[in-house]
């Protein structure tokens, strides 16, 4: 990172924003052709024929009109999708977002200098906070290197949403408050919020214009910790953020109505750089087994998470750390970036603070004392109960495959991401006896304010290969050829999607134009094959590559009978995390992971033996 920083001295983090190309609108014909191809694995002959007719009718009729209107919209906006995506994918959603939408991940420090150890929470926390604050300062000064693909700069806009950002609940639609500014843009908030035992505190991280040091941060954390443990538990207002969105919006309005000062306190949390959570539980965590960390990050005490914050940094009693982040303002690659930066710093310093132990005379943290009544306390009680009940239904399997990793797949000329995606397809096919419609995230950051596109990994080629693997009469050579066809197809789709040639966001745009124009929903979107193939947020497999660093994350499944599957890739291993719901009797995250590891071996075996 330091070398990168040195190299990028002349480049400012956000300097290329204005020169990025606008998000393109793909060709209607191409999108519909790709869509038809994607429904094939889920249709019999008659169903496919019917869908083909529906698509043709759409292409020649209303689809053409909607596409023209979409092109018109795109003329006036550098990103025709941005506002729509934010609303439809996040802000209009009414289910509790802390459990169902947020992404979480453990900090990887337990793999090296910070194994789980009781009594380390506050000291480690102060060091971790300091590195996070240094990253914030780099961003404020625009010294964070611009992300690039080769020499092409990628969109950096989401980095504005990492700090001092919060979702605010609304009756029908939430909104996002963002208070971050770069130094050249002016003043921005400089305080963090700390949640501990149902109470909330804030303190400034600058003193005399400089960041406060780890010993000073430790003084602040110790003050809060001792106060909370020596006095009764607080009203746990934060738990309300884990509620159903409209219920939380009404509770928030009521809270503000009780006392206008409550709004001032809420705004202090909203505008804080991030929330630091002090948990009093200790999840089991070793490099081989850290499922419990994920369970506690997603389903832990809602009284010490502000579910709507773009960044909750969570500390556990045994010195294990992690994060819970609202997904609305940004995608997980941001968290991967800051988490990796912090982890590298901890490795450099052997997990210790080596600077001055001096503690200056800095103001003590300020407690945010909300005015509450019986109704609010009852709302808090209900919120906690619903969150903990829903979270107890979650099954998480986090596991590390150590037989081989990227090094071997590259040697076999197989793209490691595609390798894992196809292993997942085979595992699902073996476990459930049918193809599983699958969403893999592709990034579209080549374009202005680009975020994501859907790669539909369950291709005709992938299914043919899965079938051959289960067919005793198929030769090794035939299986290998089918697998390589599936690889080629997936790699092409990923390239297309990253370069603005996907079709899922395009179809969403056409549907939203119809809605805005007050037109009936086109038949294409009512067709059973639309949802059976994953359309309308119905993907049974919701997946994402977290990257090639030491960082791991997870999100809950998109549908009740589905899985969330997230993974990162290293030279010598694949680290995977799978989520499912216990109340769904047909899914089992642990079994699926077992089958995936089995598939990894089968695939490499195929490459090694097929040419003998």
Curated annotation (Swiss-Prot):
GO cellular component: peroxisome
Catalytic activity: octanoyl-CoA + (R)-carnitine = O-octanoyl-(R)-carnitine + CoA; 4,8-dimethylnonanoyl-CoA + (R)-carnitine = O-4,8-dimethylnonanoyl-(R)-carnitine + CoA
Entry-annotated residues carrying N6-acetyllysine: 406
GO BP of this protein: carnitine metabolic process; cellular response to norepinephrine stimulus; coenzyme A metabolic process; fatty acid beta-oxidation; fatty acid metabolic process; fatty acid transport; generation of precursor metabolites and energy; long-chain fatty acid transport
Entry's EC annotation: 2.3.1.137
UniProt-listed InterPro entries: Carn_acyl_trans, Carn_acyl_trans_N, CAT-like_dom_sf, Cho/carn_acyl_trans, Cho/carn_acyl_trans_2
Principal location: other
Residues annotated with N-acetylmethionine modification: 1
Organ and tissue specificity: Liver.
Functional summary from the UniProt entry: Beta-oxidation of fatty acids. The highest activity concerns the C6 to C10 chain length substrate.
Name this polypeptide is given: Peroxisomal carnitine O-octanoyltransferase
Gene: Crot
């Amino acid at each position: 990172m330091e070398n990168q920083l040195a190299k990028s001295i002349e480049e400012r983090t956000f300097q290329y924003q204005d020169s990025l190309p606008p998000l393109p609108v793909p060709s209607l014909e191409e999108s519909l052709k790709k869509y038809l191809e994607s429904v094939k694995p889920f249709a019999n002959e008659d169903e496919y024929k019917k869908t083909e007719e529906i698509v043709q009718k759409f292409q020649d009729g209303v689809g053409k009109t909607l596409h023209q209107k979409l092109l018109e919209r795109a003329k006036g906006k550098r990103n025709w999708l941005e506002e729509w995506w934010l609303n439809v994918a996040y802000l209009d959603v009414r289910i509790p977002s802390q459990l169902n939408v947020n992404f979480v991940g453990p900090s990887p420090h337990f793999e090296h200098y910070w194994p789980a150890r009781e009594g380390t929470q506050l000291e480690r926390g102060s060091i971790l906070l300091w590195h996070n604050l240094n990253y914030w300062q780099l961003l404020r000064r625009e010294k964070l290197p611009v992300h690039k693909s080769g020499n092409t700069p990628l969109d950096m806009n989401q980095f504005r949403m990492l700090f001092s950002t919060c979702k605010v609940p609304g009756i029908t639609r939430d909104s996002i408050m963002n208070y971050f500014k770069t130094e050249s843009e002016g003043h921005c908030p400089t305080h963090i919020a700390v949640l501990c035992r149902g109470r909330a505190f804030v303190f400034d991280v600058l003193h005399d214009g400089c960041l406060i040091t780890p010993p000073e941060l430790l003084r602040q954390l110790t003050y809060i910790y001792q106060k909370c443990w020596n006095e009764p538990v607080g009203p746990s207002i934060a738990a309300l953020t884990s509620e159903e969105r409209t219920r939380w919006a009404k509770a928030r309005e009521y809270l503000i109505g009780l006392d206008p000062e409550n709004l001032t306190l809420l705004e202090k949390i909203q505008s804080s750089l991030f929330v630091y959570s002090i948990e009093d539980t200790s999840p089991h965590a070793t490099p081989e087994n850290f499922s419990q960390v994920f369970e506690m990050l997603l389903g832990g005490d809602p009284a010490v998470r502000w579910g709507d914050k773009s960044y909750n940094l969570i500390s556990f009693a045994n010195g294990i750390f992690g994060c819970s982040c609202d997904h609305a303002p940004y995608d997980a690659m941001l968290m991967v970036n800051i988490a990796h930066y912090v982890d590298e710093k901890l490795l450099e310093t052997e997990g210790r603070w080596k600077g001055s132990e001096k503690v200056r005379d800095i103001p003590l943290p300020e407690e945010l004392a909300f005015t509450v009544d019986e109704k609010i306390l009852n709302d808090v009680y209900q919120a906690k109960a619903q969150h903990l009940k829903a979270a107890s239904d979650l099954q998480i399997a986090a596991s590390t495959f150590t037989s081989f990793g990227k090094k071997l797949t590259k040697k076999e000329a197989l793209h490691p991401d595609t390798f894992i995606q196809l292993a997942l397809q085979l595992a699902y096919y073996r476990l459930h006896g049918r193809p599983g419609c699958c969403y893999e995230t592709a990034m579209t950051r080549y374009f202005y304010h680009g975020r994501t596109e859907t790669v539909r990994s369950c291709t005709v080629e992938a299914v043919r290969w899965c079938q051959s693997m289960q067919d005793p009469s198929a030769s090794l050579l035939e299986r290998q050829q089918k697998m390589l066809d599936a690889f080629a197809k997936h790699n092409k789709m990923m390239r297309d999607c990253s370069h603005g040639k996907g079709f899922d966001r395009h179809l969403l745009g056409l549907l939203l134009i119809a809605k805005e124009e007050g037109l009936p929903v086109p038949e294409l979107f009512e067709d059973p094959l639309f949802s059976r193939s994953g359309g309308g947020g119905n993907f049974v497999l919701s997946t994402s590559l977290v990257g090639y660093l030491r960082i791991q994350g997870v999100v809950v499944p998109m549908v009740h009978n589905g899985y969330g599957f997230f993974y990162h890739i290293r030279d010598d291993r694949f680290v995977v995390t799978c989520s499912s719901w216990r109340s769904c009797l047909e899914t089992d995250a642990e079994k699926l992971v077992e089958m995936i590891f089995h598939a990894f071996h089968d695939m490499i075996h195929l490459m090694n033996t097929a040419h003998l």
